Every structure is written in C-alpha cells, then in structure tokens.
Regions:
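Active-site-adjacent structural segments surrounding the nucleophilic cysteine of cysteine proteases
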Residues: 16-152
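N-terminal Sec-pathway targeting helices
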Residues: 1-12
Length: 153
C-alpha cells in the first residue's frame, strides 16, 4: 500500500509539473515572467505594459520577455500603432551597410502582415539595409519594403 501511495504521489507531482511547465511557456518562460514582474516594480513603463497586457499582441509581450530593449517600443505601441514617422533611414554611404532595427520607432509601428514591422519585419528591415548599402539610397525604409510586400501578397 505504501508503494502505491508513493507511485501515485510521483505521478501526481509529474502531472502538476507538466501542467505548470506548459502554462508558463517552460522553465525559462516562468523565470522570465518572474524577472519582468520584479523589474516592473521599479520601472513605470514596464509596470504599465504588464498591467495592460490586453492592449498588446501576445507576440509582442513574449518578445518583450526575451528582449528588454523593446520596453520603449512596446510601451508606445497603443498610441503609435499604424504610424510611420520618417521617409528616410538617415545618412547612408554606398558600399557600407547601415544597421537598422525593425523596432526603430521611425517605422516599427507600420503595418506588416498581421502585425507591425517592429515584431515581424526582419525581412523588410534587412532588405532596406541591403538596398542602402548597394545603392547609397536612404529613401527606401523598412516600411517601404513592407508596403511593397503587403501589396504583392
């Protein structure tokens, strides 16, 4: 009887662990959740984001867990989504490839597919970098490339 109880407790423990693991997105997901919650105590922007998760796409919150550099971008999303704030990428030298970030606030809130460039615009951002380096043109932004892709779909 004692062995049966021990086996049942082990099975129950494994089941509870499996459920908790899946709900949290894995061990690292659980650690990330807890880490951000702790950081939110001293970061008002992060606190606002976590208190208003319903205003953000799930993928955006998950990206924030993996990359805290996104705090400002995510924080501004509700008021800036759909807006693009420039028609150039800045100074460019032909033969040199500029570093562009898809979550740059100048174009990152522009629509791309079912989300915004800042979340899934690595292709348009990379393409804009290549065009700038090959041609020296600074007037092809990640949003321009994404717009072309959206029309082509």
């Amino acid at each position: 009887m004692k062995k049966i109880i021990i086996v049942l407790l082990c099975v129950f423990s494994i089941l509870i662990g499996h459920i908790a693991y899946n709900i949290s997105g894995g061990v690292s997901g659980l650690r990330e959740d807890i880490g951000l919650e702790i950081k939110a105590r001293s970061n008002p922007k992060l606190r606002t984001i976590l208190n208003n998760k319903n205003q953000y796409p799930d993928a955006m919150i998950q990206s924030l867990y993996r990359n805290e550099e996104l705090i400002d971008f995510v924080y501004n999303y509700p008021s800036k989504k759909g807006h693009v704030y420039t028609d150039t990428i800045g100074p460019v030298t032909k033969g040199r490839y500029p570093l562009l970030l898809q979550y740059d606030q100048r174009w990152g809130y522009g629509k791309y597919g079912y989300n915004v460039i800042g979340m899934n615009g690595c292709g348009p951002t990379s393409t804009a970098m290549i065009i700038a380096g090959l041609t020296g043109r600074n007037n092809i932004t990640p949003f321009d490339v994404a717009s072309y892709a959206n029309v082509s779909l």
